């Protein structure tokens, strides 16, 4: 949701291409979709990525009213390993600098997940790294890998 750094989004796009998952980008984006660094991070896999852009969070939810959403946040208390993922679930990640909006987290507290940090001096992981960790756990659970 509202990604800011093109190379992170490019790396996530490549991850989505490799796993056959859909990349949903919620605007505003911190870059243009034709950004060189975005394309470079996705390498030559962009044609294999199924992706959509949404003008805002409400538009994505309206188009997917039956979907279940998991919100990844450093403020969560439930580990991503405790979730029971399904094949149609959405994994929602926030901006690199601010994460997800506090109001969204409050409204969806039961669906908030975190990646536990073993070193309390480290606040969070890189967005693309966090996405890969949680996505592969979700795919493992639905037996896609």
Segments from the language model and where they lie:
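Post-transcriptional modification and biogenesis factors for structured RNAs
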Residues: 1-145
């Amino acid at each position: 949701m509202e990604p800011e750094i093109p190379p992170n989004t490019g790396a996530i796009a490549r991850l989505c291409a490799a796993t056959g998952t859909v990349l949903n980008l919620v605007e505003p984006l911190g870059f243009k979709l034709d950004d060189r660094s975005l394309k470079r991070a996705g390498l030559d896999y962009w044609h294999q990525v199924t992706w959509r852009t949404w003008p805002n969070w409400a538009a994505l939810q309206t188009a997917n009213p039956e979907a279940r959403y998991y919100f990844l946040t450093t403020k969560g208390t439930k580990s991503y390993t405790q979730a029971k993922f399904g094949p149609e679930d959405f994994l929602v990640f926030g901006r690199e600098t601010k994460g997800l909006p506090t109001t969204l987290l409050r409204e969806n507290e039961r669906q908030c997940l975190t990646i536990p940090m073993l070193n309390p001096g480290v606040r969070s992981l890189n967005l693309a790294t966090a996405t890969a960790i949680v996505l592969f756990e979700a795919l493992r659970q639905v037996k896609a890998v």
